[in-house]
Amino acid sequence: MKKSLLLFLSVVMLLSCKAQLPPGEYTSTNKKAIAAFENALTYFNQRNDEKAKKELKNAIEKDPNFIEPHLLMAQIYAENKETQLAIDEYIKTLEINPKFDKRTFFNLANLEISIGKYADAKKDYEAFLKYTTINPDWKERAEKNLANCNFAIEAIKNPVPFDPKNIGDGINSNLDEYFPAITADDQTFLFTRNNRTETINLQEDFLISKKVNGVWQKAALIGSGINTAGNEGAPNLSADGQILFFAACQEVDGSYGPNRKGYGSCDLFYAQKVGENWGKSYNVGGAVNTNMFESQPSFSSDGKSLYFVSGRLGGYGETDIYVSKLSVNGSWSAPKNLGPKINTPGKEESVFIHPDGKTLYFGSNGHVGMGGLDLYVARMNDKGEWSEPVNIGYPINTYGDENSVLVSSTGNLAYFASNRAGGLGGLDIYHFELPAAARPGIITYFKGKVYDARSKAPLGAHFELIDLETGKSVIESDANPGNGEFLVCLPIDKNYALNVSQPGYLFYSENFALKELADKSKPYLMDVPMQPIDTGSVIELKNVFFETAKFDLKPESKVELDKLVAFLTVNKTMKGELSGHTDNVGDKKMNLTLSQNRAKAVYDYLVTNGIDAKRLTYKGYGDTKPKVKNDSDANRAMNRRTEFKVVGK
């Protein structure tokens, strides 16, 4: 994990080392060696490293035990990322005189941990920490990295499975591809590509690919409405692929691209799909964006939370992870810092909230890990509290920087970018099987298609999914008006009610039990035919529930009945009949009475909640009007129902 090294051996340090000796003396008395070293200092101050190294080699040749040239040579090598050569020079210094300067152990250990030499780094950090007078900042850094060494040594002994596969040339090219985003149904893949040229080093744009027969097709630019001559990055798609969040940074002229305005530095923007095309992009707003760095958004699958990374004032470190909530009026709340369990005095970035809504993946160099930016997973409990983050393990995490992880809705696959050998060029996007311990909760996606029951024309209807156990709304949104489709992610251990409404149509209700799915790996698909409001039209109240053989309304019926109240309140002149129906099991007379009482229970609820009794009637039909034959348990269940029929508009 490459990181900025704390190399304190600047010219100032060298002079301070000299000051520890008798006045006017170096660690050498060889005049030619001293002259060569002082020439090297002059070249070093002029940033002429090659001439400085030549003079340093000359000084060392004249006196191999001359410490100062070794120290300056180590710094030059380190600054030019010739890490092993820098390490060799520090080791030579310690061989000459291990007590010359305690900082030599510190700087050597920093280099060793940066290339994964954990045992060597551990030894040198321990040697450094034995000194009693240490700069507090250096001591804190050494103690943290010593903990990293201890963690890494054990992690390497206990590796997790890791076999990354290149995602293919439909997405990857000889350029850099990174920051992947994917829809919950695994059919649309969006990512960032740096379309650099000979004259432009950074030109970031978004590309999109569709999966056909299990293969990602050749990616194409997402369109001029989003991509600009500037840079767009860190994309994130809503679960259904209808909303795109991304970051854009301020250009030299102060803009964020054509017709885009911001608050300073990098801001978050969003765009919505209109049919098959993307609409105009908009700034998320001043509640979220500041004049500091905001980037790397992750939109929760329920459409209620936006996680992102910010360098704003008041955080715990260089960059922290925040979350903002979407209010009922469509505005974003003031962001909340995720707190010290997640954020550290270091850097947190590349946040991703899984569609299960409870599992958070992110990169950090502040938690104990392999030495720099590692990938971590944290989980939210039922109280909304985050667990301690867990490092997802070696060799997924290494001494290099790891970030930008994306986890599929199924939870078994993770995507990341790497410039590892064997790719198509530059950074490529790879996927791998996520270790079981790092996987999120099991979910499936629910995909619906809303249309006019007569014409089959798609409808952009409003829909809401409700947890039947808690009565709480899980997600509320609109279907795509172009194709009538919607897609949401849902935990499989719950049962849900679906309510769909559209002006001019009867509202639609359904309930389904994901707990009872035979194959939990497959999505739940549903057609939603909407009936135009006409006399004789019928709504089956599928989310009105009674105790067995009783007419007491269950508490979970309230949501549906309130929808019916709202529907009748909007359609002020509508009149209707509430009807109860049973199957053919049991005494016919008792069934007739039961159905009558159940219809009346719904009637009473509506009247109690403000609907004029003159607009309503109720009747029980027993088993006289079955929808299907009473020849199976499933069919008998369909015949046990409560309906609302329009008898006048």
What are the residue ranges of the model-derived segments?
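Short, conserved micro-motifs composed of acidic
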Residues: 28, 34, 72, 79, ...
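Alpha-helical segment of the N-proximal tetratricopeptide repeat
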Residues: 29-62
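Periplasmic OmpA-like peptidoglycan-binding domain that tethers envelope proteins to the cell wall
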Residues: 364, 368-371, 571, 577-649
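Short, acidic Ser/Thr/Gly-rich low-complexity loop/linker segments typical of extracellular
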Residues: 469-485
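A short, solvent-exposed beta-strand micro-motif common in secreted/extracellular proteins
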Residues: 484, 494-504
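Structured interaction patches on ligand/partner-binding surfaces of diverse proteins
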Residues: 503-527
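Short, solvent-exposed beta-strand/turn patches at coil↔beta or beta↔helix junctions
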Residues: 533-574, 582-590
